[in-house]
Amino acid sequence: MDAMQKTIEYTSVSRIAGPLMVIDGIEGIAYGEIVDITTPNGDKRTGQVLEAREEIAVVQVFEGTSELNTSETKVRFTGDTAKIGVSYDMLGRIFNGAGKPLDGGPEIIAEEKLDINGYPLNPVSRNPPNAFVQTGVSTIDGTNTLVRGQKIPIFSGSGLPHNKLATQIARQAKVRGEGEQFAVVFAAMGITGEESNYFMDEFKKTGALEKAVVFINLADDPAIERILTPRIALTTAEYLAYEKGMHVLVILTDLTNYCEALREIAAARNEVPGRRGYPGYMYTDLACLYERAGRVKGKEGTVTQIPILTMPDDDITHPIPDLTGYITEGQIVLSRELNRKGVYPPVDILPSLSRLAGNGQGEGKTRDDHSKVISQAYAAYAEGRGLRDLVAVVGEEALTERDRSFLKFADAFENSIVTQGVDEDRSIEETLDYVWDLLTILPREELKRVSDELIEKYLPKK
């Protein structure tokens, strides 16, 4: 678009439907272009081109289409895509879903203005995810180890304490090593006012805000803003990582609300729906978010992602968790059964998995016994869980002494490893020591996954 076209104001709005506006008689317009809109009473609004064909543009209005009409509304196409002004000074600040200050502080003086959609990374320019990120949560650090540059979602359900876990991770997360800079970018989408107050209070009172950038999109904010929020958050994270050399953990919650916004916009455009009414391009759209995690050759910083989503009806085969699982490198699953028992965080380690855990475990990263002792504990816990079903049928009296020891181990594992205080920050060494303590419950001959050398070095003497 040339300079002359940027000055043209169109009044050829032909149709307004929901958050969308159709403009006729235009030319030289591109997909994703930002639009300045003047309402009949002179107010300014912003929109984005969702579709451009022949002489027609379909524009999504960020602030909604109330008070707009087809005869007096003026539209100007800017020729620019959606951009966010980024700066190191964003650390310690809270913004709304569109990147405007929400904490009463001044506007950010941008060091750079970046396209919120990011830029495609050549796969050859990526380094494999590597090195340990400590969250202070045993069920993540021990069994589902998080690695710098990884993307691993948390699959939750309505009413489960994923918000509490998200703030705990944001507060406690750190990278090990001298001189390493670490930051958290936290983006909440489609949340209630109560949840917003909870997040802001938690970040402020615990001091976590000092190393964090927070973006909050409320449930009553426009759907298009919900689409922008994670992109703005990831653009901020990429700037801090690749321009400032920081290791950045991005927490996105709740991706289910994001996907509902995708469905709402697709329905307004009369698109042919895919599975359960979601647009057919939802897989591609989610991949555009998740694939922005990683490590880049020649850059010091990294971007690590923990997207959180609530599974509708606790259905892990629902399109949102299903498609997410194809793109990401594992999953952390919260259990309603454990939550009913009063276990916090209610992480069920059996269906949970970190496919890159091995890249962050071992000597020089965590400890030399990490992978072996966790493998032993995982196997013992799985056997103990299976024995619970048997006990429900035949009773505990029918079990052998060996079986009873595994049953006891499973109970102890849930009570001392899985269960953890919301303010309890465990180092990886503490987590592994707790696991070794529990292994004393089992007969020595059952410790088949750890070497004699590791047993002599770490297993407490009875």
UniProtKB/Swiss-Prot annotation:
CDD domains: ATP-synt_V_A-type_beta_C, ATP-synt_V_A-type_beta_N, V_A-ATPase_B. Keywords: ATP synthesis, Cell membrane, Hydrogen ion transport, Ion transport, Membrane, Transport. Transmembrane segments: none annotated. GO terms for cellular component: plasma membrane. The keyword Cell membrane applies. Has multiple subunits with at least A(3), B(3), C, D, E, F, H, I and proteolipid K(x). Belongs to the ATPase alpha/beta chains family. Component of the A-type ATP synthase that produces ATP from ADP in the presence of a proton gradient across the membrane. The B chain is a regulatory subunit. This is A-type ATP synthase subunit B.
